[in-house]
Amino acid sequence: MTDIGAPVTVQVAVDPPYPVVIGTGLLDELEDLLADRHKVAVVHQPGLAETAEEIRKRLAGKGVDAHRIEIPDAEAGKDLPVVGFIWEVLGRIGIGRKDALVSLGGGAATDVAGFAAATWLRGVSIVHLPTTLLGMVDAAVGGKTGINTDAGKNLVGAFHQPLAVLVDLATLQTLPRDEMICGMAEVVKAGFIADPVILDLIEADPQAALDPAGDVLPELIRRAITVKAEVVAADEKESELREILNYGHTLGHAIERRERYRWRHGAAVSVGLVFAAELARLAGRLDDATAQRHRTILSSLGLPVSYDPDALPQLLEIMAGDKKTRAGVLRFVVLDGLAKPGRMVGPDPGLLVTAYAGVCAP
């Protein structure tokens, strides 16, 4: 198990490479990373104002001209007006190309602050400090940034790798339980596409997997981050292999949009994982036991595994505009076995209907 008293570093081997440091009390690391910057802007969500101010003061103590930029929580903060606000503040305080941003918050804060960093002066440095499980294992690692528009989720964005990612496990101590549960969907995804030990650890004790004070969760986080780091290193710009990280996301993103983002990302992805497993099972590509294992593990963590039985026509319409769709043809990441991800391109409409009915069955 990962020793939460000793920081662990996972390297993301892109060019240039950067570290993902997992531990507790990592603000000293942040000071060291940014001590040579003239100005720094800390982009944070409302509930983290106190931590953001501590960061500002610590950087100021190192001679850095640091500022705070507060943005709305969750998906409400991932739109063009919020990015425009960040740009306006960056211009007002004079952030230059050799300065830096810090993102502090969940996955949405990482996405929008990362996009602002990618586009301001055509790219300035950013350090991510994710404070949610979802942000730690998914949004903060890999360099994907983006915002939502009326056309869809994350359709506007850029690849912009951070200077570093600091995963401070202490922030999980105060994370609401429903946030912890939803973040586990991305951990489970990593288990199915690449690291079955993740699934074994969860099955052994689902409640221990959700305990921020225990030693199981840090190990799950390390393993999930390692999966993503290895995939990103092999395919930074999502030309092919990185697409496997979208397992469960085609339907998941459609559910989020249909629900106007009232459903949490992890909850929607959980249903998407079950749907993708059912697609593969019906197509003869995945055995019954592994497909059922999706439901069992996700349910044991308190994640949803079914959705509105009447929603498929609307979901299909939304999925047709998904960024993973090419030339109007739906694409799904599916499994050809445990830790054997593949793709299903243009599935038969009848197969989609039958698979969705299976998801909606009690």
Swiss-Prot record:
Its main location: cytoplasm. Its EC number is 4.2.3.4. Gene3D superfamilies: 3.40.50.1970, Dehydroquinate synthase-like - alpha domain. Coiled coil: none annotated. It is found in: Cytoplasm. One of its GO terms (cellular component) is plasma membrane. Signal peptide: none annotated. It catalyses: 7-phospho-2-dehydro-3-deoxy-D-arabino-heptonate = 3-dehydroquinate + phosphate. It comes from the Bacteria. NAD(+) binds at residues 45, 73-78, 107-111, 131-132, 144, 153, 171-174. The keyword NAD applies. The keyword Transcription regulation does not apply. GO terms for molecular function: 3-dehydroquinate synthase activity; copper ion binding; nucleotide binding; zinc ion binding. Its cofactor is NAD(+); Co(2+); Zn(2+). Pathway: Metabolic intermediate biosynthesis; chorismate biosynthesis; chorismate from D-erythrose 4-phosphate and phosphoenolpyruvate: step 2/7. Was identified as a high-confidence drug target. This is 3-dehydroquinate synthase.
